[in-house]
Amino acid sequence: MDRRIGAQFYTLREHTRTIEDFEVTCRKIHEIGYQIVQISGTPLAAEDMKPILDRYGLKVVTTHRNFEFFQDNLDEIISYNRTLGCELCGLGGMSDCFRASDEMTGEFIRQANPIAAELRKAGLYFGYHNHAFEFLKFGGRYVMDRLINETDPENFKFIVDTYWLQIGGQNPAAFIRKMGDRAMAVHFKDLRILNAKSVPTMAEVGEGNLDWDDIIRACEEAGVRWALVEQDICYRDPFESMKMSYDFLTAKGFE
């Protein structure tokens, strides 16, 4: 596994709306110490971002788009990722219309498989990012089991999210081990209990309740290529949150 910890820019989405803000964000992330990133949540063109990323020594390892964009603009996704020098084309999540039934899960798989195959022909990979709904059961089987078993392991990879695995009732480390190298990237996202009503929420890595020693070991054993810090909801300045997570993980042996 790449020991350089990554920054998921979705955490910083409010700070990547303009090219000027994007440059400031890249500078701050570089100053924290991050060397790899995921591009997500920004409307900016790859051609405009790439020189800035290069200036601050930031390597893009994955991106995120919604499924409708994959369906309608696959050539653009291929061009976008190639411009950024990034081989993993991430899907942010299954569209709502596919989440309602076993039949619709099958329809998503039927539509996603040829997209993943086309990306592989272009030298890229399709990466499915999980939430918790994939652990709904239809007909006695998880949606996730169908995503694993009815897709091509050579084409259809996963961007595993530790927080959403825990919310879905899964052990993140055990799930990563089960996935092996199909888990091409992992979002390191912690979970803490917000209040006495037992409301779960996201936290800086190391500030919550997940077992990070076991998760990190699982990533190493499974052959995960990249680990990226993500925190959709921050309760302080998001750059401070990103630094806290970075400091925790560098103490665990990341760079």
Describe the role of every protein-language-model region.
Residues A7, I29, V37, L53, ...:
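Conserved, mostly hydrophobic/aromatic
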Residues D237-E255:
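C-terminal helical cap(s) of enzyme catalytic domains, especially alpha/beta-barrels
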Residues Q8-L12, S40-T42, H64-E68, M94-D96, ...:
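Active-site beta-loop-alpha junctions enriched in small/polar residues
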Residues G208-I216, A222-E230:
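H/E-rich (His + Asp/Glu) clusters that bind or coordinate divalent metals
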Residues E20-V24, L74-D75, M104-A112, G140-D145, ...:
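Charged helix-capping and loop-helix junction motifs
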Residues M1-E87, D181, F254-E255:
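N-terminal pre-domain/capping segments
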Residues K121-N209, I216-A218:
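Acidic/histidine-rich catalytic cores of soluble enzymes
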Residues E47, R55-K59, F67-F158, I167, ...:
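Active-site acidic/histidine proton-transfer and metal-coordination neighborhood
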